[in-house]
């Protein structure tokens, strides 16, 4: 259940203040003396009231009271005489005067003095009044509380008869209503209604006053909203209707549902119980339009999260991580030339929450040689340095306990610097931080202490001597003081040559504002105060002022620092800025630099990111350029965007810049410190303050403001209109574009009912502020309000207005409807809706599925498809085409089997359009076949040669064998013929011996023949075998050579094929990139055309902003698309190379296997080889 935030804006008012006490009252400036006044404070602490016998009741709003002091004895003789007349002599006044300081801004201050009967009452009232003022929370009370406050004011401002004049009431409603209407309304309420009538305060209750406001100023706008919620069917809202309204309109949809639960019936009933005046409706759980109106005007519907007004931020980060409320030339009450200096300004500025004030210190010229504060030689009046230090001591920690930085611009001699040091030491005491904290030594790389570390401490920002120089001069000072020499410790070093501070290149000019013209003469300077008075009285012309400006020459701050003052400088040591790179290398966090607005803008223009990084580490101070002699202010937002801590402004000028400053620093308990966003503090984050695209980690927002109506805007019958601006990053800043129509002759309750002013894309809500301002028909500001976007509440809200000095106006409010959403780019609304409400999205899809089932379509027949929000069919086709070349994972590309590789590269989704390469295809290539043919020819030629050699050797061997056989046959035949012839001649019986010899010879011949045959066969076998072996070796050699050539050729062909694949893929990628660029150009043109034709865009500035935003968005989107395409293409190329490498490795493996197989065949052949012959 959503819990109500308990806004405890009241401070406890002591009983003695409520009971009152009698004082004599006087004002010195206008000589007003009023004795025996009964002063009181109401129970809420709204008013300090007083009344004396025979006079009308008077009130002073406590919100306008700046300080309560013990008053000094008046110097005006008339006042003293008046007090003497009532029995209070001058001698009796010591310690009996209460000074009440009040004003609607920081410059126009009024002083009311109250003289008590005794010092005890004075002390009691000073403490009591101090305890109830500076109630910043009370500046944010609801419109209902403001009405009650106004009613109380009317009741206090009674006439001499102690009654409320009807005329006082008519003045409240003077604008837009005739007195007759008011008189009639009073009459209907049973109250006196004549023009000169009086009303008893007891009869004029708050409920009567509220009813009167509703009669005279009816809230028709809320009535219309009420009817819209209930459909104009009833006079009440039910609990369900109220819950629905609260969740749909009054709750920021971006909020966490656990930390900020939705409203439920129980919470709605609590609201009805609290705000519904009709008891019967309350019992029935219903709320009327009156109860609804009361609820909308209550604290529960504040325009900001009220806890942001408390101290809610962490205060333990280094000082450099905070924005610090800072003042420039704090002492001035007006212009920079001839202006008046005032000690009071220091009080007012510090009480307003400022934490850095400036003191321009110069040598006093009087006999007492007292240091003074003035604007150099710019014809401004002087104030005493010691008075300023006293004022700072009294007010530094009244409204905030966090550290105050005194920015010295030191032009004083060493003598007067010593006096300055002693004043700071003696008056501030323990408040002055004279030495660095032990936990945060002054060392490079060491972070600055936090605001919590420096609570109730005053730091001095001034140049510091080099450590060795400071030590040397301090020792000399100490030795001379111990020696008891007559020389004063303040001036013993006065004649020393000026020593360099930290280094010669580190001199810093706090105000290099005017560096032209000749220095003024001593005579001119002698008339400075007279000139200042002339300027104040308007006797000096603009030409005179311009002449003085032209002759003015800025005198830089001294570098001849007194060592005693130097020792008091620690965490705010100014140095001359030498560049961001130098500062980063030095890494000295306690060094800081000052930039006038022009120089600061120059660095922002050229080194924005470096400036942000610099401000993460050390502090920077920005101050107005010298040309702002009218004390106008620059726009601080641009420097907050860069993380500059001390964006110093002229507090005396309540212009737009100061309004932004005061509105921003109202958060975090008005303590003067605001923690910078995370990305502006972390060294690992990069932030460009000129970015036009959302920052990483930061969700952009859409903010729309519908201005519905205004209430009590003016007591005059005038026309009014409302402007709504936003300030933030340059891309978030929209000003002078959104304004309502003019509603004439009605300052009381104008109804604007404008269409919503939409700030469509706020990329950095943390730095953005909303400004709502009301102007009259003469373009004069009536009231304004600054609302930081990071604490803005959504819904129908009443926005109470402030004056130009940020003081709350009593009754004026603007009724608005504020809508806050997460920024959703065009075309993504459906997706975001589905994500934010998946149940609703699912219910729609389920309903459609049910409808399809009713038509006979089964759920299983419905495919799950991705959501497509594209409005461009061609874009969809392009996306489909791009999807065809999306690479798969590496696991899908990796071949898992030899067979898969042997069959070629598998089809890959990303590279499937590239022709596949298979080894079989390589072997069918013409070059390979031609090479095979050539190799076969070589092999055939060798075989033919071998066959010829075979034939030749075979013939030779056969001839040799035939010759041996023939010789054997011949010799055998010869022996047989001799035997035969002998047997014929001698007879068979006589030739036995011869026959026996012949047989022996034949046997011997046969044996010899066999031996010869055996020898020749062995020789032939050897020769034939050697020839066969030689032929086999030659054939094997040429086969090996051919195989190697085949492998090399296949590898070469594969590499060529790979190169062609790569080239084809490159061409495909080039074509793809070209198509994408053309498609992107087309989208950009179509989008620009759509914006130019969009009739809902009503002004040129918004159209240009949309085009600029579109171009920025498209640029980022297109670059991302191109980056993704390049990554995809790179991945495809890598995948292709990987597959090609795997294929090449496979081919080499296959080649090795072929060679191994051939070697095995060779070995088998050798093992099977036997001696052979052809015979």
Curated annotation (Swiss-Prot):
It catalyses: a 1,2-diacyl-sn-glycero-3-phospho-(1D-myo-inositol-4,5-bisphosphate) + H2O = 1D-myo-inositol 1,4,5-trisphosphate + a 1,2-diacyl-sn-glycerol + H(+); a 1,2-diacyl-sn-glycero-3-phospho-(1D-myo-inositol) + H2O = 1D-myo-inositol 1-phosphate + a 1,2-diacyl-sn-glycerol + H(+). SMART domains: C2, PLCXc, PLCYc. Preferentially expressed in the retina. PROSITE patterns: C2 (PS50004), PIPLC_X_DOMAIN (PS50007), PIPLC_Y_DOMAIN (PS50008). Changing residue 621 to L: In ARCND2A; likely pathogenic. Transmembrane segments: none annotated. Keywords: Acetylation, Calcium, Cell membrane, Disease variant, Hydrolase, Lipid degradation, Lipid metabolism, Membrane, Phosphoprotein, Transducer. The keyword Lipid metabolism applies. Residues 482-511, 863-895, 1082-1110 are annotated as: Disordered. It is found in: Cell membrane. The modification Phosphothreonine is found at residue 886. Residues 313-463 form the PI-PLC X-box domain. GO terms for biological process: G protein-coupled receptor signaling pathway; lipid catabolic process; phosphatidylinositol metabolic process; phosphatidylinositol-mediated signaling; phospholipase C-activating endothelin receptor signaling pathway; release of sequestered calcium ion into cytosol. The modification N-acetylalanine is found at residue 2. The active site is at 328, 375. One of its GO terms (cellular component) is plasma membrane. Pfam families: C2, PH_14, PI-PLC-X, PI-PLC-Y, PLC-beta_C, PLCB1-4-like_EFh. Changing residue 358 to V: In ARCND2A; likely pathogenic; decreased function in phospholipase C-activating endothelin receptor signaling pathway; dominant negative effect; no effect on localization to cell membrane. Residues 565-681 form the PI-PLC Y-box domain. It is an enzyme of class 3 (hydrolase). CDD domains: C2_PLC_like (cd00275), EFh_PI-PLCbeta4 (cd16211), PH_PLC_beta (cd13361), PI-PLCc_beta (cd08591). Residues 493-508 have a biased composition (Acidic residues). Residues 1095-1109 have a biased composition (Basic and acidic residues). It is linked to Auriculocondylar syndrome 2A: An autosomal dominant form of auriculocondylar syndrome, a craniofacial malformation syndrome characterized by variable mandibular anomalies, including mild to severe micrognathia, temporomandibular joint ankylosis, cleft palate, and a characteristic ear malformation that consists of separation of the lobule from the external ear, giving the appearance of a question mark (question-mark ear). Other frequently described features include prominent cheeks, cupped and posteriorly rotated ears, preauricular tags, and microstomia. This is 1-phosphatidylinositol 4,5-bisphosphate phosphodiesterase beta-4. It comes from Homo sapiens.
């Amino acid at each position: 259940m959503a819990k109500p935030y308990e806004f405890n804006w009241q401070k406890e008012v002591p009983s003695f203040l409520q009971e009152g006490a009698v004082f004599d009252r006087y004002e010195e400036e206008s000589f007003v003396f009023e004795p025996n006044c009964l002063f009181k404070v109401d129970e809420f602490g709204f008013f300090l009231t007083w009344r004396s016998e025979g006079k009308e009741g008077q009130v002073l709003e406590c919100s306008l009271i700046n300080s309560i002091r013990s008053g000094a004895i008046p110097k005006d003789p008339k006042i003293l005489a008046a007090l003497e007349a009532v029995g209070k002599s001058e001698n009796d006044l010591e310690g009996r005067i209460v000074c009440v300081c009040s004003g609607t801004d920081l410059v126009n201050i009024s002083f009311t003095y109250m003289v008590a009967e005794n010092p005890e009452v004075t002390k009691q009232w000073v403490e009591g009044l101090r305890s109830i003022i500076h109630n910043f929370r009370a500046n944010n009370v609801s419109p209902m509380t403001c009405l009650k406050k106004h009613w109380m004011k009317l009741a206090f401002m009674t006439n001499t008869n102690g009654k409320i004049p009807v005329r006082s009431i008519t003045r409240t409603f003077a604008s837009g209503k005739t007195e007759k209407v008011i008189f009639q309304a009073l009459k209907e309420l049973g109250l006196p209604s004549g023009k000169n009538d009086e009303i008893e305060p007891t009869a004029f209750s708050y409920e009567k006053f509220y009813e009167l406001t509703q009669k005279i100023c009816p809230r028709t706008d809320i009535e219309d909203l009420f009817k819209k919620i209930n459909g104009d069917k009833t006079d009440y809202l039910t609990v369900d209707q109220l819950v629905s309204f609260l969740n749909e309109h009054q709750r920021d949809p971006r909020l966490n549902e656990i930390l900020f639960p939705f409203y439920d019936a129980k919470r709605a009933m609590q609201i009805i119980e609290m705000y519904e005046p009709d008891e019967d409706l309350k019992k029935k759980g219903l709320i009327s339009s009156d109860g609804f109106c009361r609820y909308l005007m209550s604290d529960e519907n504040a325009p900001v999260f009220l806890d942001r007004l408390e101290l809610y931020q962490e205060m333990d980060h280094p000082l450099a991580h905070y924005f610090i409320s800072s003042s420039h030339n704090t002492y001035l009450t007006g212009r920079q030339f001839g202006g008046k200096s005032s000690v009071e300004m220091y009080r007012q500025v510090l009480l307003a929450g400022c934490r850095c004030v400036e003191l321009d210190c110069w040598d006093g010229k009087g006999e007492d040689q007292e240091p003074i504060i003035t604007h150099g030689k710019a014809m401004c009046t002087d104030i005493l340095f010691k008075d300023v230090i006293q004022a700072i001591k009294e007010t530094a920690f009244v409204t905030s306990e966090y550290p105050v930085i005194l920015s010295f611009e030191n032009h004083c001699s060493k003598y007067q610097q010593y006096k300055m040091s002693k004043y700071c030491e003696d008056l501030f005491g323990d408040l002055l931080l004279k030495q660095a904290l032990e936990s945060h030594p002054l060392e490079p790389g060491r972070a600055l202490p936090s605001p919590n570390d420096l609570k109730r401490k005053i730091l001095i920002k001034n140049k510091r001597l080099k450590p060795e120089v400071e030590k040397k001069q301090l020792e000399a000072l100490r030795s001379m003081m111990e020696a008891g020499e007559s020389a004063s410790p303040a001036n013993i070093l006065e004649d020393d040559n000026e020593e360099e501070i930290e280094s010669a290149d580190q001199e810093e000019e706090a105000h290099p504002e005017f560096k032209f013209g000749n220095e003024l003469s001593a005579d001119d300077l002698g008339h400075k105060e007279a000139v200042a008075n002339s300027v104040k009285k308007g006797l000096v012309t603009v030409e005179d002022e311009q002449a003085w400006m032209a002759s003015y020459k800025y005198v830089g701050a001294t570098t001849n620092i007194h060592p005693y003052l130097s020792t008091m400088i620690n965490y705010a040591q100014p140095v001359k800025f030498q560049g961001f790179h130098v500062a980063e290398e030095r890494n000295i966090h306690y060094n800081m630099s000052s930039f006038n607005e022009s120089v600061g803008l120059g660095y922002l223009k050229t080194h924005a990111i470096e400036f942000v990084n610099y401000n993460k580490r050390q502090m920077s101070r920005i101050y107005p350029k010298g040309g702002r002699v009218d004390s106008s202010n620059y726009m601080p937002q641009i420097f907050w965007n860069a993380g500059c801590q001390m964006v110093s402004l002229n507090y005396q000028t309540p212009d737009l810049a100061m309004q932004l400053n005061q509105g921003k620093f109202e958060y975090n308990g008005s303590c003067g410190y605001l923690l910078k966003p995370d990305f502006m503090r972390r060294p690992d984050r990069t932030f460009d303050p000129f970015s036009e695209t959302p920052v990483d980690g930061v969700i952009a927002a859409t903010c729309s403001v519908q201005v519905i109506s205004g209430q009590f805007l003016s007591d005059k019958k005038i026309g009014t209109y409302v402007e709504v601006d936003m300030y933030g990053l340059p891309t978030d800043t929209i000003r002078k574009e959104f304004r309502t129509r003019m509603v004439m002759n009605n300052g009381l309750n104008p109804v604007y009912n404008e269409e919503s002013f939409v700030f469509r894309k706020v990329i950095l809500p943390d730095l953005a502020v909303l400004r709502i301002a009301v102007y009259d028909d003469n373009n004069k500001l009536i009231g304004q309000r600054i609302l930081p976007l990071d604490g803005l509440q959504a819904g129908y809200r009443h926005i109470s207005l402030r004056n130009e000095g940020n003081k709350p106006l009593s009754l004026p409010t603007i009724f608005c409807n504020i809508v806050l959403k997460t920024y959703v780019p065009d075309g993504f609304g459906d997706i975001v809706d589905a994500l934010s409400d998946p149940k609703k999205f699912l219910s729609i899809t389920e309903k459609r599925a049910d409808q399809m089932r009713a038509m006979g379509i089964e759920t299983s027949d419905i495919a799950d498809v991705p959501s497509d929000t594209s409005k461009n069919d061609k874009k969809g086709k392009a996306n489909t085409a791009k999807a065809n070349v999306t690479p798969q994972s590496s696991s899908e590309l990796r071949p898992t089997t030899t067979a898969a590789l042997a069959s070629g590269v598998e089809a890959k989704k990303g590279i499937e359009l590239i022709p596949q390469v298979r080894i079989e295809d390589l072997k069918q290539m013409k070059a390979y076949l031609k090479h095979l043919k050539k190799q076969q020819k070589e092999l055939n030629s060798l075989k033919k040669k071998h066959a010829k050699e075979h034939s030749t050797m075979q013939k030779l061997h056969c001839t040799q064998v035939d010759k041996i056989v023939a010789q054997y046959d011949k010799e055998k035949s010869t022996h047989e013929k001799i035997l035969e012839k002998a047997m014929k001649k001698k007879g068979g019986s006589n030739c036995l011996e011869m026959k026996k010899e012949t047989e022996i010879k034949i046997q011997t011949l046969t044996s010899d023949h066999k031996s010869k045959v055996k020898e020749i066969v062995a020789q032939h076998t050897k020769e034939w075998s050697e020839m066969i072996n030689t032929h086999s070796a030659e054939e094997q050699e040429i086969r090996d050579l051919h195989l190697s050539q085949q492998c090399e050729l296949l590898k070469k062909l594969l590499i060529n094929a790979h190169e062609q694949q790569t080239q084809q893929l490159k061409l495909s990628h080039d074509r793809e990139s070209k198509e994408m660029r053309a498609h992107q150009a087309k989208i950009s043109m179509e989008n620009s055309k759509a914006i130019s034709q969009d009739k809902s865009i009503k002004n040129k500035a918004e159209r240009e902003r949309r085009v600029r935003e579109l171009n920025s968005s498209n640029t980022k989107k297109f670059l991302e698309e191109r980056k993704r395409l390049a990554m995809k293409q790179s991945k495809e190329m890598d995948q292709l190379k990987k597959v090609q490498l795997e294929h090449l490795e496979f081919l080499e493996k296959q080649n090795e296997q072929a060679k191994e197989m051939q070697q095995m065949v060779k070995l088998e052949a050798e093992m099977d080889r036997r001696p052979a012959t052809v015979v």
